[in-house]
């Protein structure tokens, strides 16, 4: 009789992650905080605890004592498909890791489980499976021509051919959310910062692939990282600036892992860069904003990398800004709902999470809801529009540009 093979495998899980699966005490603290669980109407399968317990059951059926004695118990395909849907119904925001009493690194775990399933031919979710082909072929997820990478650059913006500082625009800002790119470039010019850009040599950072469990597909993410690092080196980069939290996280955390070496340049978010200039008294403001502003921490910038204070420092020093905090901030903020491929794969769920976050902002009576990420901005705008709320959603760098008397159009 042919030997039965397990329905799942452990090849993509580290020894630590296997121990973490066993360390969950089922306390349920993560369930109270999970944004997608709440936005789904408390669908049990989306709860972090439930996902860990179900995978633990799968492991027991495949590799437990009974499985060793009598062979693995087959896990119905329908169960695996349902689990795939639930593990992809997560923004990988990381709040469950923050509140976990057992210290489980859930963000890494969810991504490992997604990769495990994709390798078995289960997943990713919906149109997320187009990411490797699109990004591999076009070097961006929007099927845009690479020759158009710098089409957004207005005549008044000066870009050096080579410079110590390189602005990595990102696909979203460079193709879709041009106000973010305008603001960043003009602010750098205004402050006398000489900077270069990669132009058509800038490829996608790979975040969308990594977050959705497709880090291994055709080796695309590693090739993206390798190409971008080499292109940045050719530009003479000593410091690379990012206005996109997703690109920033991918470059700072994922690229070194993919390449197996430290990056030969410093990775800095533009909020950190501006905060340092303010501390050195190198910014001369020209206009008072005179608005009440609250701030949403992007998960990729905040919980994933630990940049919480710089954006707040910048906002609090913009003339006329009355800065107010929402109820859930910093390590305990509520996700905007766009991350982890949820905006692309399950837009209704992403919108539900965004609506919850917009309600947090409305409770502060702020005029402006700001953030440091184009994905957060897009989804928060969608949440605002869905709720028909009269509130401006702007990136911090856009507010800085306005206070410097600059256009963002």
Curated annotation (Swiss-Prot):
Parts forming coiled coils: none
GO biological process: methanogenesis
This protein's pathway: Cofactor metabolism; coenzyme M-coenzyme B heterodisulfide reduction; coenzyme B and coenzyme M from coenzyme M-coenzyme B heterodisulfide: step 1/1
Cofactor entry: [4Fe-4S] cluster
Molecular function via GO: 4 iron, 4 sulfur cluster binding; CoB--CoM heterodisulfide reductase activity; metal ion binding
Pfam family for this entry, one: CCG
Keyword field contains Cell cycle: no
Keywords: 4Fe-4S, Cell membrane, Iron, Iron-sulfur, Membrane, Metal-binding, Methanogenesis, Oxidoreductase, Repeat
Reaction(s) catalysed (UniProt annotation): methanophenazine + coenzyme B + coenzyme M = dihydromethanophenazine + coenzyme M-coenzyme B heterodisulfide
EC number assigned by the record: 1.8.98.1
Binding locations of [4Fe-4S] cluster 1: 24, 27, 30, 100
4Fe-4S ferredoxin-type domain: residues covered: 14-44, 81-110
Family: Belongs to the HdrD family.
Other remarks in the entry: Methanophenazine seems to mediate electron transfer from F(420)H(2) dehydrogenase to the dihydromethanophenazine:CoB--CoM heterodisulfide reductase.
Biological function: Part of a complex that catalyzes the reversible reduction of CoM-S-S-CoB to the thiol-coenzymes H-S-CoM (coenzyme M) and H-S-CoB (coenzyme B).
Subunit description: The dihydromethanophenazine:CoB--CoM heterodisulfide reductase is composed of two subunits; HdrD and HdrE.
Protein name: Dihydromethanophenazine:CoB--CoM heterodisulfide reductase subunit D
Gene: hdrD
């Amino acid at each position: 009789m042919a030997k039965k093979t397990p329905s799942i495998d452990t090849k993509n899980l580290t020894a630590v992650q296997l121990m973490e699966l066993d360390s969950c005490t089922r306390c349920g603290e993560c369930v109270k905080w999970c944004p997608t669980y709440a936005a789904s109407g408390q669908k049990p399968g989306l709860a972090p605890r439930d996902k860990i317990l179900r995978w633990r059951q799968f492991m027991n059926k495949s590799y437990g004592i009974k499985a060793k004695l009598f062979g693995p118990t087959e896990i119905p395909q329908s169960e695996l498909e349902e689990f795939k849907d639930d593990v992809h119904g997560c923004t990988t925001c990381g709040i469950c890791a923050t509140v976990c009493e057992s210290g489980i690194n859930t963000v890494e775990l969810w991504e490992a489980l997604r990769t495990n399933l994709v390798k078995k031919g289960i997943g990713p979710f919906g149109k997320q499976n187009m990411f490797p082909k699109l990004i591999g072929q076009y070097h961006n997820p929007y099927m845009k021509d690479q020759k158009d990478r710098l089409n957004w650059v207005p005549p008044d913006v000066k870009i050096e051919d080579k410079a110590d500082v390189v602005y990595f625009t990102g696909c979203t800002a460079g193709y879709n959310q041009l106000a973010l790119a305008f603001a960043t470039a003009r602010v750098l010019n205004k402050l006398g910062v000489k900077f270069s850009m990669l132009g058509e040599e800038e490829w996608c950072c790979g975040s969308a692939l990594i977050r959705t469990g497709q880090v291994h597909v055709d080796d695309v993410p590693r090739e993206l990282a390798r190409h971008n690092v080499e292109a940045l080196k050719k530009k003479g980069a000593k410091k690379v600036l990012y206005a996109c939290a997703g690109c920033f996280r991918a470059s700072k955390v994922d690229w070194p892992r993919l390449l197996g070496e430290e990056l030969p340049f410093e990775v800095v978010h533009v909020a950190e860069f501006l905060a340092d200039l303010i501390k050195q008294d190198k910014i001369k403001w020209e206009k008072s904003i005179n608005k009440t502003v609250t701030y949403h921490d992007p998960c990729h910038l905040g919980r994933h990398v630990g940049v919480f204070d710089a954006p707040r420092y910048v906002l609090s020093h913009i003339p006329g800004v009355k800065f107010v905090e929402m109820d859930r901030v910093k390590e305990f903020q509520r996700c905007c709902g766009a991350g982890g491929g949820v905006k692309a794969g399950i837009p209704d769920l992403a919108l539900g999470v965004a609506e919850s976050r917009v309600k947090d902002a409305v409770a502060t009576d702020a005029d402006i809801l700001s953030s440091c990420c184009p994905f957060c901005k897009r989804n928060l705008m969608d949440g605002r529009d869905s709720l028909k709320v009269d509130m401006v959603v702007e990136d911090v760098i856009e507010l800085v540009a306005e206070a410097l008397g600059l256009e963002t159009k």
